[in-house]
Amino acid sequence: MSDSMTRTQWMHEKKWGVFVHHLEQIVNNPTHSRSMGKHTSWDEALLDFDCDRFADQLAEAGAGWCVLTIMQRTRFMLAPNDTYNRITGYAPGEACPKTDFIDRMIRALDQVGIALLLYFTGDGPRDDPQAQKAFGCYGPEPEPDFVEKWAAVAREYSLRYGEKIRGWWQDGMWIGYTPELLKQYADAFRAGNPNAVIATNFYGCYDEFGELLTRPRPGCPYDDFSAGEIVHLGALPQLGAAVFGGRPIRWHILSFLGKPADYFEAGGWGMPGSRYTPGWMYDYADNIHRRGGILTLDICVRRDGIIDEEQMRVLRVLKTV
């Protein structure tokens, strides 16, 4: 068994997990249903989330892990970060909150035996003019100076939380990333936990019509499981491994449980409802596990930490997989 397969064995034993996009532009946007009509400071929004109740719901369903977004494109982070503030010039509370939401989530999930993985990006806070200029995340290809700065932000989080962060799922790694640049992230992710599992989302980027915009780059030599992002579930692993660059890593698939809008079939991330019946999802998750793979489902979670009830009806059946 390869090092990556050994390192991810705990994930196979836990079988499946959830993915949560807890982002300021969603849960603090009064036009979005998940915000419950509220717009406050970022700190107040984070304090509205009941981490214990959220963890209890996952435990009720038997989830093994939760992948939680630290940020996505905007300046707003999920926890304090002195490195980020120093680079950007933002004061505490302006981009990085004063409250440590990640620590709160760790404590709640730890009580029910659920692992926490963090979502990070490869393109940084590129939608915020001040942060974009400070980091140099202009795109489309990353500059070494940006990678050094952005990896330093991840390193601070990794060192703070140590072994409580079981892994990292990194998005936006499509083009321009070399093994040398990827190593900076891998070293940062494992600074606090040498056994942290890693997946980098390197697949080709598609537009809303399904046209390939960029070609996938070769697999990351530091990945332990496949990023697995896909629109429709249904694929199955062969003997639990995905082979990238001749190296076996854990086969993993990730997609959204929610119902997308009719005009955009890939737009179901974080949406309510379920595209799949409980019976279908049970059979699919069971088949993946029997073949050595793992499954992560993106779910709809409100600002207060409550999971969409239709999705909970699906998740509950997975406890017996």
Placement of each model-derived feature along the sequence:
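Mature catalytic domains of secreted/periplasmic carbohydrate-active enzymes
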Residues: M1-V321
